[in-house]
Amino acid sequence: MVAPSLPHSNRLSFDDGVALQEHFHAQGWTDGLPIVPPTTDAVAACLDWAALPADHLIGVEPVRGRAITAEKVAINSVMAGCLPSHFPVVVTAVTAMLAEPFLLHGATASTGGCGVLVVVNGPIRHEIGMSSGFNAVGPSDRASTCIGRAVRLVLGNLLEVRPGEIDRSTLGHPGKISFCIAEDEEQTPWASLAAERIGDPYVSAVTVMAAMGPRQLMNEWTTEPAEILDTFVAEIKANMRHYSIWAGNYAVVIPPQLRAHFDTAGWSKADVREYVFEHARIRRGEWAGVGKRSAVGEKGEHTYAALTEPDDLLVIAAGGPAGGFGAVIPPWLGTTSRAITVPVGACIDC
């Protein structure tokens, strides 16, 4: 196998900040929002924080063979507004996306319009000021917003994942600008997502998932875990009818008010996953009721599950303290892309 050639960065100079912004916009290097100038010092600060040389190869995009270096990721992290302390999380998210089971090219080139959900676990959440509470799935804090945005800028500027170029999304969704969540590990007896997926409850880690936009739900009328989960299941089944029937990595976000009912009843994350696995199923014939009769064919009585196994479900503890709300985050296209979890500082192919 021929080693990929490493990209080199050009040094640019501008008369003023307005000229810089307009040049970056004109080149298609932004997401439509203003960027932070990626000065030599700012980029070097990110690299120094992570102890990475500029030409360190973070990975190679498996389909197109594009080499992604630490310097290129640092440039886009600075542009997104990241501090140097945020940079290791961005590097880890990029590392996870480059894993072959994630199918980065397919997910980012599809007309389906998915974004990249980034979930952060471990001590680094507090070290960089991430919030797991109010507005957890929206703009909640600087670190979450900038890390999610950095991931998008990396895709656009290093892999041409821009609308009308590699990105062929028919609609897309707002999470494609930034979609980063820190899990609430303190206000729950549940094991963290990272602890469940890599077996270490103390490590800082990042999980990435090719995800559609969140579907918010509410159930304040029961304290029974099964009834609460029936609402989540109904949302998953609606996605199977309206969008994609194929099983994959669904994520559910459960805030404190609902989590308290699970805690009182002694339900673990494993119990949640098992219940959803058993109940989130539809018959193909149900497509007839949502205008897809011609796609039913002779498989009307065939049953499809949302998950291939219980562990396909990502259960994320996050959200503000009040309100019986939750969210289902559907996968892009079933098992075509798999969620990937990587410890901060790890290298998949080393």
Give the predicted meaning of each segment.
Residues 1-350:
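Non-transmembrane, aqueous-exposed alpha-helical and coiled segments at domain scale
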